[in-house]
Amino acid sequence: MRTTDMADELFRGPETELPAGVRLATAKRGGVTVTRVEIAREGLARPRGRYVTLEMPSVSVLDERDTDVIETGAAELRALLPPEGPVLVLGIGNRRVTADALGPRTAQKLLVTMGPQHTLPVRGIRPVAALAPGVSGDTGLTLRQLAAAMVDAVRPAALICVDSLCSAEAARLGRTIQFSDTGLHPADARHARHLDAAALGVPVIAAGIPTLMDADEGADLVLTPRALDSVIAHGSALLAGILNRALQPRLSVAQLCWLTG
């Protein structure tokens, strides 16, 4: 089987055929299919924890104004987050490589509420900081070193890592969003992007959209969606809209668009 970061691609079929310790449930919300996978034990294809996948029409035709998708995604993401406390968002990836630019592009669109310009607390506004740490070739530091330094500086209640994901199915590229509370654990062992609570001492939520797939098992070749530029542009806007709504539930989608536009 080709490499995949998507938990629902690994565990499918009737409940009686699922491995022991795995639960799967699917529901429709408007035009969005929500699949929840809960892995209750170690030793399976993905780390123990909760995974939520939203499946929809291509994100290349959606953006931060698509209220139904944003409300559905925000509710699912909010359920994985601590109810209060500062949140640090890291946009993982290389902004110069289109298929890997989802994280940095998403971080640019977030409503940041920490820093010198936000010295006075506003009732109901959650403190949020965002950063695109770049790649080790540019910084000379590993992702884990940078993440640990940022966590030490911000002292967040949770860390959200946004990254491009890998799917095993071409039809799902640019059409799904996955959230998980397991941290960042790329299925491809060649990627050194592993961040989790054990390494950083805070809950780590992973969020992403699949933008590539292996062309063949064991080959150094990947496939990307035909409209990749549009997938990254619209997908990052949609994902930022979901994160903003999840982190600032007292602000409407329209208000968040105005504040970040």
Regions of interest found by a model, annotated:
Residues 105-139:
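Long, charge-dense
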Residues 1-49:
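N-terminal amphipathic/basic leader segments beginning at the initiator methionine
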Residues 128-159, 164:
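Catalytic-core regions of hydrolytic enzymes
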Residues 55-57, 86-97, 130-134:
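Short glycine-rich or small-residue beta-strand-to-loop segments that form or flank ligand, phosphate
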Residues 41-81:
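An N-terminal, well-structured beta->alpha segment
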Residues 131-132, 145, 161-261:
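A structural signal for small-residue-enriched, beta-sheet-centric alpha/beta enzyme cores
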Residues 92-102, 137, 164-168:
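Gly/Ser/Thr-rich loops at beta-strand to alpha-helix junctions
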Residues 72, 76, 98-115, 176-185:
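A glycine- and small-aliphatic-rich helix-loop capping segment at beta-alpha/alpha-beta transitions
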